[in-house]
Design a protein with these regions (language model features):
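Catalytic cores and adjacent flexible loops of soluble metabolic enzymes
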Residues: 1-192
């Protein structure tokens, strides 16, 4: 598998290293993760931008995760530091946004690419904002039907949009991967 990954054509599959919020707000750790991802062949590195004040209500309110998320927040200064560091080491860097406010912060630093996570894949104000303000939009589809995805993406030019097939159960059993859905997406979307 190692050889297949590193000998692939550059215009084909892209490997995205998901840093997420695993840095827990520690910039030194985040930079190390970016460096290691690049060293190990990632084409892009992705983190998450969110403000716990903007998070919708959910299970994280009752199980203590909201407090953990708070520690992992990246403000504009920290995000810019990571973006500039990534640029310095020639590693493409981008983030997921949970709200329009988060997307605005990302746009101030980098309007080239943004990701919308599965749980926000039906957040029309966020999607419409991104369609107007970003050159490339990646949308995860783990919690949406095809009909919902088509409706959400109707205002995004096809050349800007990449759809990710996602399964929102962790760890995912192979029987739950639903890989044929990728072929279905290819019928409707240019980049899957």
């Amino acid at each position: 598998i190692y050889w297949e990954v590193f000998s692939r054509k550059k215009d084909m599959t892209k490997i995205i290293a998901e840093i997420g919020w695993n840095h827990m707000g520690n910039i030194k750790l985040a930079k190390k993760m970016i460096r290691e991802a690049k060293k190990n062949g990632a084409d892009l590195v992705k983190t998450q931008i969110f403000n716990t004040k903007n998070l919708k209500s959910g299970p994280w309110d009752s199980d203590g995760r909201r407090e953990i998320y708070k520690k992992a927040e990246l403000n504009k200064i920290k995000f810019k530091q990571l973006f500039n560091y990534s640029k310095k080491i020639k590693c493409k860097f981008f983030a997921s946004a949970m709200s329009v406010e988060d997307a605005k912060l990302i746009k101030e630093i980098n309007n080239n690419i943004i990701k919308i996570p599965s749980m926000e894949s039906r957040n029309q104000p966020l999607i419409d904002y991104c369609a107007k303000n970003f050159k490339n939009i990646i949308i995860s589809t783990g919690t949406s039907t095809l009909k919902e995805i088509l409706k959400s993406c109707k205002n995004i030019p096809k050349k800007k949009l990449t759809i990710l097939h996602c399964v929102s159960s962790y760890p995912c059993k192979f029987t739950d991967t639903n890989l044929p859905k990728i072929d279905l997406f290819k019928k409707y979307f240019k980049r899957v």
